[in-house]
Amino acid sequence: MIVYQDLLSGDELLSDSFPYKELYNGVLWEVEGKWVVQGAVDVDIGANPSAEGGDEEGVKIRLVKVVDIVDTFRLQEQPPFDKKQFLGFIKRYIKNLATKLSEERQAEFKKNVEGAAKMLVSKLSDLQFFVGESMHDDGSMVFAYYKDGATDPTFLYFADGLKEVKC
């Protein structure tokens, strides 16, 4: 199994269990999330309920709907950004990330990241923002939105901000 960690914070953000599609010459990865139902069962094996006057069966099921990617990697949702805040984050993130890339990759990244950033700005009001479990200030941001008519979210990752780790 391959896990993709945030290059800047080390948080696990994705794995090869979730196929991705490259956008903007590989600058962004698009990953389809799914709503899943998780449940916990509580079984009361205590005293005889009829003797205590209770009619309960002793089994309680609690179901919770979660998004698989958010739950699996313990992503933490962040408050929405306005355009000024978002542009400030993107500039800082690109600057921090570029220092971690090879010179050759830096040039390619800088050439293609502008289109990706413009697309994100155009969807800003539709985006949900997530960070890794550590909530590191300078770490990667994971973006989620719903495509037209979709019931499951689509996630966007900066590919160069991910480090491949084999487990």
Curated annotation (Swiss-Prot):
Keyword Calcium on entry: yes
Organism, scientific name: Pseudotsuga menziesii (Douglas-fir)
Full protein name: Translationally-controlled tumor protein homolog
GO molecular function: calcium ion binding
Family: Belongs to the TCTP family.
Main location as per UniProt: cytoplasm
Lineage: Eukaryota, Viridiplantae, Streptophyta, Embryophyta, Tracheophyta
Gene3D superfamilies hit by this protein: Metal Binding Protein, Guanine Nucleotide Exchange Factor, Chain A (2.170.150.10)
UniProt domain TCTP: residue ranges: 1-167
Annotated keywords: Calcium, Cytoplasm
Cellular component terms (Gene Ontology): cytoplasm
PANTHER family: TRANSLATIONALLY CONTROLLED TUMOR PROTEIN-RELATED, TRANSLATIONALLY-CONTROLLED TUMOR PROTEIN
Family matches, as InterPro entries: Mss4-like_sf (IPR011057), Mss4/transl-control_tumour (IPR011323), TCTP (IPR034737), Translation_control_tumour_CS (IPR018103), Translational_control_tumour_p (IPR018105)
Its biological purpose: Involved in calcium binding and microtubule stabilization.
Cell compartment(s), UniProt: Cytoplasm
